């Protein structure tokens, strides 16, 4: 891709998200979403093959449908309240349609079917943007309208997302699909706490962004997209492969790693609000995610597959790739648990 074109595209993606997050007018918010959607499609189609084209079309159709629903909700709210200001939705129907539109943009269940297919069909860079940056805009709107969201609707979606995110990833060998199902499950956790403590959603999102960014950077560094190719990475980058074990366990939510913080705090917050059954079910369903992370850990770092002598020397001929941010992100993705006492500000 031409560097000049690349700069324009990435600037538009950043600008689109910023417009959504900072605007107080629904029409500007909608414009930001459209800029965001149209700018990422060239990145998704960077390598022109049928899979990338199919993924781009699926993404475009899903996001366009979600944008139409969003505008429908805005118009219903406008007819009811007479204003375009981004605030809590006064009309229950408008609130429900808006929640469904944003759930479709985020990939919450039952609107999750596009996420694994699209992520699998695009390059690792586009997959990373899709599962991290593209979540910011819809979540910022959900955060703003959280007081008027129907609790039953959002909790049903979140429980389904955690279940689907765990179940869907069980039999996968493609790393991008595993990360997509992991994203669905994490979005479920964020949606569950939204009506109780929206600030905690931001904490969860921050940790999710850090761990997902670190994993995708490691995949890109080793040029791996399947569990089989990942099992050979110890020949190329033994240190990074060892660190990958801790990142995977952190994503699974095991103490004493960073990924345990949001799960612990969300379950604690929901229990404080006299919700016992939901957090119990969420904790049980999180074990499904943990299982496929453990399986990935086992095949990647705890076993050594038979390989030829040529393969063992492969690391000597690897071209050096930029890994400036990686050490910092690895530390943040694994060692933030001791900072938890400082998060009392969230209560």
From Swiss-Prot:
This is NADH-ubiquinone oxidoreductase chain 2. Core subunit of respiratory chain NADH dehydrogenase (Complex I) which is composed of 45 different subunits. Interacts with TMEM242. The chain crosses the membrane at residues 1-21, 59-79, 93-115, 149-169, 178-198, 201-221, 239-259, 274-294, 325-345. It is a multi-pass membrane protein. Keywords: Electron transport, Membrane, Mitochondrion, Mitochondrion inner membrane, NAD, Respiratory chain, Translocase, Transmembrane, Transmembrane helix, Transport, Ubiquinone. Core subunit of the mitochondrial membrane respiratory chain NADH dehydrogenase (Complex I) which catalyzes electron transfer from NADH through the respiratory chain, using ubiquinone as an electron acceptor. Essential for the catalytic activity and assembly of complex I. It is found in: Mitochondrion inner membrane. It catalyses: a ubiquinone + NADH + 5 H(+)(in) = a ubiquinol + NAD(+) + 4 H(+)(out). Disulfide bonds: none annotated. One of its GO terms (biological process) is mitochondrial respiratory chain complex I assembly.
